[in-house]
């Protein structure tokens, strides 16, 4: 095959010799064209509104309704379907704001055991394409399909189109795929055409593509960083490229050099298979800097749930919990502690992270919060407990029992008291 092809139908994968609005073979309007279609091999696969899509799959009566996954007035949104997003609901939004923005929304408490099971099914299909699969979270991963054309008989782009169709037909969820020559641009490409998207950013176009984009397209640049750049006369990626590297370092430290590389479409990170993974983490950047425990602690619980879900999906436990904070002046604060036994339970991750957070609350405000687990071990070595510390075994048993009851009787059968506990200052973070 050569790169002279104009269009490929994403549904029947016919190759079309001239530009058309629809495929003449199957009538689909989902046509893909790119001059580097047979060369690009780094992909980012992102499941569309993953939790909400699973709930709609399992209850078709929800299909046309705005579904919001989350719970408790003081909790945060885990996922919102695309209908709810039209009303302004988004991930990590406080639930009371989500209810106000979308009063007709159907609120469903997350069923992590179910979501982890589906995530593993999707991951297994990824591994049929390439062993180089790097999970990013429960619903997204990077894949490196370099050298797989001999195995599959097609370039990565066509292989990924077949994969997308297979996931939708066999598992009942949809994915958006970004294809490029590095991870940074593959991630951006996957966001260009959601849901059920398939987009590519090639090497020849990368600088021109990025140039006019706002600096917020770069990972880690939120409103506060954008405002700081604005004071330097920088609003676009092209503006940022024109800043002297020395000035970037003075503004943002090591982050400045990282952003300079990304602004120039350079990203040397490899796709790292999960057996090489050293840590599992999740983080979020706030629209407004805050030191308010009423805001920070529920989000800390949300992030702990995300890390726990990914660890269970990847079958890891870990013994070192790390809290990551970034101040309003971009100073990075990290605090770590080692727990008594490796864990992948959300409650234990949250307890450790919350203890690390308490002394830092007065030192904010913060623009970013993150939680990570490292010193990874196989999942069967996690949460065993021992004779010297029976509380570990009891806590692990309680959380597993809750997971089991929720799997049998629904997520509402038992409600975790962590969000209530987040309002306290002297408890153990659980009820």
Tell what function each PLM region has.
Residues 341-431:
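Acidic, metal-coordinating catalytic segment for phosphate/diphosphate chemistry
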Residues 106, 142, 322, 338, ...:
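Short aromatic/hydrophobic contact patches that present stacked aromatics
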Residues 141-147, 334-337, 378, 383-388:
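Short, hydrophobic beta-strand segments
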